[in-house]
Swiss-Prot record:
This is Insulin gene enhancer protein ISL-2. Gene3D superfamilies: Cysteine Rich Protein, Homeodomain-like. Residues 328-337 have a biased composition (Low complexity). The modification Phosphoserine is found at S154, S157, S280. It is found in: Nucleus. Keywords: Developmental protein, DNA-binding, Homeobox, LIM domain, Metal-binding, Nucleus, Phosphoprotein, Repeat, Zinc. It comes from Rattus norvegicus. One of its GO terms (molecular function) is DNA-binding transcription factor activity, RNA polymerase II-specific. Signal peptide: none annotated. Residues 192-251 bind DNA.
Length: 360
């Protein structure tokens, strides 16, 4: 139904239509009293001058010969109302005619030619499975590909390592290219090479057991580890530092992986579900949301009085004939034949009203 608002913003300066006196007609358009012979009435109690009732878009005059629509306090002709507020195709944004066949997908309506997959542009026929994602149609094949890509994730190029000078490039792993780092830092004097310390299984087991109990051992614990492993204090100190750094990097990486998995699951929530099945085309009967408001003509009370006066003027000759008949009867100048001819013109008395003779 068309929403008709009875309280309009412009009635404050033009007069309140709801507080009009009984028997008076106030124009909703200009707010003044209507003294015209005819009043255009829209809905039960909205009345206009004939010159005030017009379309808000094209200014076409509206009367009882055309269809009028009221929305948000404005009047529209049928053409502009369909153009502004009618149902449009979700693909081409063009309105429908009453003879068009449409395809429906949930709350969206499409032309038959516009009901296509947004990826491969294949027209979806009745019985085809499809999905509706962000107001875009996807056929079954493209829907499956989208699910696979979202589950696998798009490959990302590795970003620059922290602390790497600009201009350095690291090729992808497995490409077979040699990593080349070119810097503009001046070469420093060659330093003495350090001997790499190789730990055996027993030493590693001792250090790992101590690290599991306390990742930051104190000086007394380090002295005991020196006696137990036979390693230098510097080697033990560096091993604990490297172990703490590796564990910290591993925890950060695991946290990032968990966040990535959570975001992938959230992105897949809009894609999972049962595929829709295209139905048969249906006729688009209601091209306009709402029903038209009938515009009627209204005749004021004085119009009925004037018609009654005209009718009484037409009946005046018969009244004069009866008056002349009464005057002729009072003077006694009329003959019996005149009375008989005049009485023959009068209607006969019904039989039902003739009294029956009373038996004595």
């Amino acid at each position: 139904m068309v929403d008709i608002i009875f309280h309009y913003p412009f009635l404050g300066a033009m007069g309140d239509h709801s507080k009009k006196k009984p028997g008076t007609a106030m124009c909703v358009g200009c707010g003044s009293q209507i003294h015209d012979q005819f009043i255009l009435r829209v809905s039960p109690d909205l009345e206009w001058h004939a010159a005030c009732l017009k379309c808000a878009e094209c200014s076409q005059y509206l009367d009882e010969t055309c269809t009028c629509f009221v929305r948000d306090g404005k009047t529209y002709c049928k053409r502009d109302y369909v153009r502004l507020f009618g149902i449009k195709c979700a693909q081409c944004q063009v309105g429908f005619s009453s003879s068009d066949l449409v395809m429906r997908a949930r709350d969206s309506v499409y032309h038959i030619e516009c009901f296509r997959c947004s990826v491969c542009s294949r027209q979806l026929l009745p019985g085809d499975e499809f999905s509706l994602r962000e107001h875009e149609l996807l056929c079954r094949a493209d829907h499956g590909l989208l699910l696979e890509r979202a589950a696998a994730g798009s490959p990302r190029s590795p970003g620059p390592l922290p602390g790497t000078p600009p201009g350095l490039h690291l090729p992808d792993a497995g490409s077979g290219q040699q990593v080349s780092l070119r810097t503009h830092v001046h070469k420093q004097a060659e330093k003495t090479t350090r001997v790499r310390t190789v730990l055996n299984e027993k030493q590693l087991h001792t250090l790992r057991t101590c690290y599991a109990a306390n990742p930051r051992p104190d000086a007394l614990m380090k002295e005991q580890l020196v006696e137990m492993t036979g390693l230098s204090p510097r080697v033990i100190r560096v091993w604990f530092q490297n172990k703490r750094c590796k564990d910290k990097k591993k925890s950060i990486l695991m946290k990032q992986l968990q966040q990535q998995q959570h975001s992938d699951k959230a992105s897949l929530q809009g894609l999972t579900g049962t595929l829709l099945v295209a139905g048969s085309p249906s006729a688009h009967e209601n091209a306009v949301q709402g029903s038209a408001v009938e515009v009627q003509t209204y005749q004021p009370p004085w119009k009925a009085l004037s018609e009654f006066a005209l009718q009484s003027d037409l009946d005046q000759p018969a009244f004069q004939q009866l008056v002349s008949f009464s005057e002729s009867g009072s003077l006694g100048n009329s003959s019996g034949s005149d009375v008989t001819s005049l009485s023959s013109q009068l209607p006969d008395t019904p039989n039902s009203m003739v009294p029956s003779p009373v038996e004595t």
